[in-house]
Amino acid sequence: MPHFSRPFAREVGLLAAAMKESVIAKAMPRKRTLIPSPLAWSPTAVPVAPPLLPVVAERGGTQLRTPLPVAIIDTREQNPLSFRRFRKWFADIEERALSLGDYSVRGMEDSCVVERKDLADLIQSFTTNRNVFINRLRRMSECPHSLLVVTASLSDIKSAYPYRAANPNRITQSLIAVLAGLRVPFICTETHELGEEIVASYLYQTFLYDWLDRNGHGRHLSDGDL
């Protein structure tokens, strides 16, 4: 019987164990995932049409009859989100001056505040008008429902600007500071149209949750869910 050195025998044993595990792994059926890996998704993104309503509330499987909010657009907003595509989400759409923010809901002007910025306005707000903007954000942080919406992608915000006075890193990190320091959430949308849908849905849902809470239904859309 041939004699092998201990190191060689150990390597042979490890190789045999690895081959055994490989055979077992191949014999076991693989579980199919319901959602494929994001790497397999198409890189071409085409947003689908918005829903008839963002969400509905139900209790015991029966949809509740809930009122629609009245959206408010600040009259000083430049290139405003008109919400024309989402008129069925609101009882009415008003244009009048707001003391804070660009968008709100009637009856919740002091508790629901949405500030919108396109890329150029965001850069100017974090540079030339930084003190004014930070003070506005501090006031927003005191509101129960506040949201900063940027109608530009994070890639655009992080990319080089045509003017050297503004630093993409400083703008990006200022956004993170707004979230971490002031606890004001922000969301970036690639287009003006997507921003319009996000803001419209936020106003609708903020009003709906508030109505459910005030009328003894609790802050959830359906039993055991959001």
Task: State what each model feature region is.
Residues 23-110, 121-226:
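Non-catalytic C-terminal interaction segments of nucleic acid-processing enzymes
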Residues 9-10, 15-19:
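Residue-level detector of structural "landmarks"
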Residues 112-118:
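Conserved catalytic cores of phosphodiester-cleaving nucleases, focusing on short active-site segments
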